[in-house]
Amino acid sequence: MAEKQTAKRNRREEILQSLALMLESSDGSQRITTAKLAASVGVSEAALYRHFPSKTRMFDSLIEFIEDSLITRINLILKDEKDTTARLRLIVLLILGFGERNPGLTRILTGHALMFEQDRLQGRINQLFERIEAQLRQVMREKKMREGEGYTLDETLLASQLLAFCEGMLSRFVRSEFKYRPTDDFDARWPLVAAQLQ
């Protein structure tokens, strides 16, 4: 019984990995059909549906992975790092690095892969970015308490500016067909971004 569950879990992971790889390839710029995905995995469409009731559920699982990966790591940064600017830098670098390491998933983060899918999926990505922006805002609000001095500009404005930088770099990565990596020249870009945090 345990072997059967493990085999099923492995097949589910194989399906999700194939979907992510297809999103990374030139197929990712077009609608991915279950027929193409089944061919990529080497199974029938019926076999896909034994593991996932719909393609939407496959995307849900990938979004869940993105959420878990980013939110868990953000929480670790907040636990380990106490300096506000360092926290913000690490969170931004985390988002950009995650996108760079997972190009197929970056198409999901930018909404590019979801254009042909249910609106609810884009809503989940929107919620994820709202959560991250709220976290950035909270980090900024805690600065006064932690360091005795807050920002002169509104934290809501600053947090949205930081997130817009991340989204822009991820979009550039997708638009360039993954040529311009989000972390390229980060050490030169960060002082420009950090200078806005007043």
From Swiss-Prot:
Keywords: Cell cycle, Cell division, Coiled coil, Cytoplasm, DNA-binding. PROSITE patterns: HTH_TETR_1, HTH_TETR_2. One of its GO terms (biological process) is cell division. Gene3D superfamilies: Tetracycline Repressor, domain 2. It is found in: Cytoplasm, Nucleoid. Its main location: cytoplasm. Pfam families: SlmA-like_C, TetR_N. Residues 33-52 bind DNA. InterPro entries: DNA-bd_HTH_TetR-type_CS (IPR023772), Homeodomain-like_sf (IPR009057), HTH-type_TetR-like_transc_reg (IPR050109), HTH_TetR (IPR001647), NO_SlmA (IPR023769), SlmA-like_C (IPR054580), Tet_transcr_reg_TetR-rel_C_sf (IPR036271). NCBIfam families: PRK09480.1. Belongs to the nucleoid occlusion factor SlmA family. Homodimer. Interacts with FtsZ. Required for nucleoid occlusion (NO) phenomenon, which prevents Z-ring formation and cell division over the nucleoid. Acts as a DNA-associated cell division inhibitor that binds simultaneously chromosomal DNA and FtsZ, and disrupts the assembly of FtsZ polymers. SlmA-DNA-binding sequences (SBS) are dispersed on non-Ter regions of the chromosome, preventing FtsZ polymerization at these regions. HAMAP family: NO_factor_SlmA (MF_01839). PANTHER family: HTH-TYPE TRANSCRIPTIONAL REGULATOR RUTR, NUCLEOID OCCLUSION FACTOR SLMA. This is Nucleoid occlusion factor SlmA. It comes from Klebsiella pneumoniae subsp. pneumoniae (strain ATCC 700721 / MGH 78578). The lineage of its organism: Bacteria, Pseudomonadati, Pseudomonadota, Gammaproteobacteria, Enterobacterales.
